[in-house]
Amino acid sequence: AFTFAMVSVGLAAPAAMSHTPWVVGVSLAFSTFFAVAAMIIAVLKTALALSHMLSKGVEETALPTLWIWVPILTVLAITLMRQDHGISHTLGLASAGTWLTPLLMVVSAQLFVLLLGGFAMRNHRYLAKVWRGDVKGAPVFALICPGVALSVSLQFLINKGFVAAGLLISFSMVYWIFSVEPLVVMVVTIIVFMRLSR
């Protein structure tokens, strides 16, 4: 699902950057196809995984994948913003309006996924094992992607959501207070990455 989401965001780039209507149209069509495919695959995989987890529990090696929805949602949100830019600027159609509500929904879903995954990881003491270095290998690096994705989503929420809706003034004191949150998430992610790389 994440692969399809990444293809989708790449195919949405021409919609955001091109001034040629047919290029924007092709970009919209293909990026939408891959975005929908990513969502269908992610929902089906999640349903199957939940069924398995409820009957047999979670294997420790699969724990990092519990947070995969976080980067998928970020990438799909970027896809939609790129598409919206092409629709409103190049095709001259009215924009769908503010991004505040969709971005709040994305960040809320991401926080919910992080909480659910965090509870499962806590039951296995997985994060403590990772921090001590007891868990090694490539799968553990999947813990980095959600941190990066959440930081990006929070930046979009602040700038394309709160500022664009007039709830925050760019570079005001409150703006900088809000901006500390994604920076903290990124710093923690970098620290975890450095710890895993030892």
Each predicted region: which residue ranges?
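Membrane-interface helix-loop-helix junctions at boundaries between adjacent transmembrane segments
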Residues: A1, A15-A35, S51-T61
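Extended intrinsically disordered, low-complexity coil regions enriched in Ser, Thr, Gly, Ala
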Residues: L48-P64, A128, V163-A165, V174, ...
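Hydrophobic cores of alpha-helical transmembrane segments in multi-pass integral membrane proteins
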Residues: A1-L11, F30-L48, L66-Q83, T101-H124, ...
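Hydrophobic transmembrane helix segments
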Residues: H52-M53, L80-G92
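Alpha-helical transmembrane segments
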Residues: S55-V58, G118-V135
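Extracellular/periplasmic helix-loop-helix junctions in multi-pass membrane proteins
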Residues: M17-L28, I87-L100, L154-I177
